[in-house]
Each structure stands twice: as structure tokens, then as C-alpha cells.
């Protein structure tokens, strides 16, 4: 999402929870009831969809889509441009590759 000045906007729905220790880069969209927990990093251009949960210490690399209701358990790194499908659960310390 870009503003009139061409800069990337970050959008967080009011019903989403983003921990104060999380880092959200520009161009990220966090949809209703999504949760981004402690010490998570979400890089540029990601979508954290409805009800998705990204747990403590995760890194979501650039351009990822964490789909509806997906859960990324703690300490995972999701590779750039990956899509975590609706309802999918990414287990502890699993490195996820693009798909």
C-alpha cells in the first residue's frame, strides 16, 4: 500500500494485537484479530491475515503471506516470498521455504 507521496504504508487493524517488542517494517498489513507476539520481526511487504498468529521470536522475511488462521510457532524463520496456507501450523524451529 502506498500513500499519495509514494511511500509504503503499514496498516494494522484495531482488533489485531502487536506486541510492543515486535518490529513491523513498512508496507506490512495486519488484518483483524491477527496476533504478532513478543520479539517478532515482520519485514517489508508482508500480509498477516485474519486471525493468524505469529508467536514469540519469529522472523517473517520480506513479501510473505501468513494466511487466514495460520499459526507460526515460536522461534521460526519464514523465508522471503513464502505463503503459509490457511490453517497451517508451522512447528517449532522449522525453516519454511518459498512455495
Q: Which sequence ranges carry the predicted segments?
A:
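Terminal amphipathic alpha-helical/low-complexity segments used for targeting or macromolecular assembly
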Residues: 1-14
Amino acid at each position: 500500500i502506498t500513500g499519495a507521496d509514494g511511500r509504503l504504508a503499514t496498516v494494522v487493524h484495531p482488533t489485531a494485537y502487536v506486541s510492543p517488542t515486535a518490529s513491523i517494517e513498512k508496507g506490512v498489513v495486519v488484518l483483524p484479530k491477527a496476533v504478532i507476539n513478543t520479539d517478532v520481526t515482520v519485514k517489508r511487504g508482508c500480509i498477516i491475515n485474519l486471525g493468524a498468529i505469529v508467536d514469540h521470536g519469529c522472523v517473517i522475511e520480506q513479501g510473505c503471506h501468513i494466511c487466514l488462521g495460520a499459526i507460526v510457532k515460536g522461534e521460526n524463520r519464514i523465508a522471503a516470498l513464502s505463503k503459509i496456507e490457511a490453517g497451517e501450523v508451522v512447528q517449532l524451529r522449522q525453516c519454511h521455504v518459498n512455495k
